[in-house]
């Protein structure tokens, strides 16, 4: 299974990196396209009238990791329309977000908005969030995914 991973906390965020390691251990093919820094509460915003910059920051053989200068939604769009145009994923997962996304929080969540792009491309997608991100809890959450 080919999975696109993204988030709103940035490419180097512990939640995303832990989820990447967990899914890689289950022999999933992964592509990671995430913001180059923190973009929490970006909601469903997109970058317009401004250039987006992308940088390959792959560290693990066989897993492509790309940092994008835009929002979480920009990351999914860049992945689907450029990087994975001829190699569509089977699933999009956004997270693990550092902080709950409950109630009206989902309206402002970049994590949730990135996952909401999935159906636009005909793909299943979901977001994962947690509060109290310790290494142990993050690993447990990644294992549940």
Show the residue positions of the predicted features.
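A cross-family phosphate/adenosyl-ligand binding-site feature
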Residues: 3-6, 17-82, 88
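Short, glycine-rich nucleotide/cofactor-binding loops
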Residues: 5-12, 105-106
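Short beta-strand segments
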Residues: 6, 33-35, 94-97, 128-129
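Conserved active-site and cofactor/substrate-binding residues in soluble primary-metabolism enzymes
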Residues: 11-14, 18, 71-75, 87, ...
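A short, flexible beta-alpha/helix-coil linker loop
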Residues: 98-101, 132-133
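Glycine/threonine-rich flexible loop motifs
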Residues: 100-109
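Hydrophobic/aromatic ligand-binding patch that stacks against planar heteroaromatic rings
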Residues: 114-118
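Glycine-rich, Lys/Arg-enriched anion-binding loops that position phosphate/diphosphate groups
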Residues: 119-145
